[in-house]
Each structure stands twice: as C-alpha cells, then as structure tokens.
Amino acid sequence: MSITLNSGYEMPSVGFGCWKVDKATCADTIYNAIKVGYRLFDGAEDYGNEKEVGEGINRALDEGLVARDELFVVSKLWNSFHDPKNVEKALDRTLSDLKVDYLDLFLIHFPIAFKFVPFEEKYPPGFYCGDGDKFIYEGVPIIDTWRALEKMVEKGKIRSIGISNFPGALIQDLLRGAKIKPAVLQIEHHPYLQQPRLIEYVQSQGIAITAYSSFGPQSFVELNHPRVKDVKPLFEHDVIKSVAEKANKTPAQVLLRWATQRGLAVIPKSNNPDRLLSNLKVNDFDLSQEDFKEISKLDIELRFNNPWDWDKIPTFV
C-alpha cells in the first residue's frame, strides 16, 4: 500500500524508522529489512547513522535485491543547517553518507534554527551550538530555509520536500509563501497523542502525514524520559491487548493499523527479523469501527518529543 504525494510520487504507507538504530548493527538491519520487503527508510542527519544506513541500502542495491527507484529514502535537515547558505552543504553530506544521488523526501526536522556548527567541529552537532551546553539560535525564518529546499528540488537532489514537528499555525504560514507545497508532515502520533485537528487540517491541504513513535512511551523508555513513568505501556494496555486478541494480531500490529486506517504512514523499527515482518503486514486487516473508537478514546494529549523540554522552546505551546 502506498500514499500518492502532492509531488506526484508514491510513498509506501509502512516504512522502517532509523532513529536509535545502533550503528554497530545498522547496516545489517537495513539490509535485512530490504530483504523482508521494506522499501521506505526514514532517517535523519541527527540520528548519526546515515553512513551505516547507506551501507545497508547499497549492499542490497549491489546484490540486485532491489533497484534504487523501488526505494523511498528519507532524511531530515537538522536545526543547525537552516541558514540557506548551509542547506545544500548539509544535503550533500547526507547524500554522500547514504551514497545515493537523490533523496525521495527531505524534511525540515524541527521549525527551530540553531547556530551553524562546521562539520569538522562536530557532526552531527545535536544540541551543540559551538559553546558547551548553551543553546544559540540563528535568526532564520522558516520560509528562507524552505526556499533553499525548493532550489534543491529544482536541482534534482530531492524529489519531495516536507516538514516535521510543525504546529498548524506554522504550516498555514508556510503554505502562504511556499512555491512547492510540503508533500509530507511527520508528527509524533500514538493513542496517547492523536492530534485530530492538526491531522484534519493537514490532510485538507493535500499534505500526507507520517506518524513516528506509534508505540507511544515504548519509543522513549531507553531515553529515560520522565513522562514514560506516568502512563501504562500501550502494549500492556487492556484496550490494545483486547483488540489484538480479537483480531489475532500483535499489539504492535494493532497500533500501526490504527494509524494507517486514519490515512497515515508509519515508520516502526525493530532489530528482530520476525517483528520486522509482522510490522510490515499491518494493512491486510481492518479494525472494526467499534475497536477503532475504543483506541481513539485513549487520547490524553501526552507528548514525549517536546522542544520545551530542551530550552523552553515554544513549538507546541
């Protein structure tokens, strides 16, 4: 199953998320994911594993397991590279690390511009802005970064461009000035954080949505996120367990199907070959309206990935 983007390209509705994939096993994991049928790989400069993702992709390409035009390779422009003069530089680094000639989709990771950090000083820079732990920002409006991305589409280095972690008001503002409409919005989305009005607005604008952290707190356990302790893991929630039992599916499959049934794409990750396959097979069944509604009642607007926690950045306030 795929979603037709407003750029005319097809995006698989289930992909493999590269966030937190260990560098030591990453190349093998990506290669194995291609072997079992994954075609979309969602990465980012900030994940620090693009070279390894590229190794896995290129091993599969070299062996003829898949052709480049059958893959949908995604990356994200990090906060430190928003200045238009640094956008192409950052994109070229990503293309070089992945060893691909173009990206299928390149997203602005966050609507936040940090001070530029030269690659030789630290790459990926993460939250480092050149002065210890201090956050230093650059006065770069989103539309300026967007214009630079539009040029990269014109140059053939990117097929589709999009945004990630953007609230509705910023999306509306971007649409007023964009020559090329965002093809995709990527958001944190799970039963504890459903964002129905944002989804309704974005879909009404012809923009596709990819959900990350579909398993909710599960995605943030290893980061020792304080809010993880506030809620029951979704895999153990009675509603999810009961729906999974009824459908003869795993809780993970139910959570992923609940999202794809809303018209969203999903990007789960797993290092386990069996789970890799079962996560991919989530569009061969439907949740009943009743089960769908029961899961939808779990919304408590609980956001785990919030820039307010970094430095009181008001992205979602």
Curated annotation (Swiss-Prot):
Substrate binds at residue 109. Pathway: Carbohydrate metabolism; D-xylose degradation. InterPro entries: AKR, AKR2B1, Aldo/ket_reductase_CS, NADP_OxRdtase_dom, NADP_OxRdtase_dom_sf. SUPFAM superfamilies: NAD(P)-linked oxidoreductase. Keywords: Carbohydrate metabolism, NADP, Oxidoreductase, Xylose metabolism. Its EC number is 1.1.1.307. PROSITE patterns: ALDOKETO_REDUCTASE_1 (PS00798), ALDOKETO_REDUCTASE_2 (PS00062), ALDOKETO_REDUCTASE_3 (PS00063). The record marks 76 as: Lowers pKa of active site Tyr. PANTHER family: ALDO/KETO REDUCTASE (PTHR11732). Reduces D-xylose into xylitol. Preferentially utilizes NADPH as a cosubstrate. This is NADPH-dependent D-xylose reductase. It comes from Meyerozyma guilliermondii (strain ATCC 6260 / CBS 566 / DSM 6381 / JCM 1539 / NBRC 10279 / NRRL Y-324). The lineage of its organism: Eukaryota, Fungi, Dikarya, Ascomycota, Saccharomycotina.
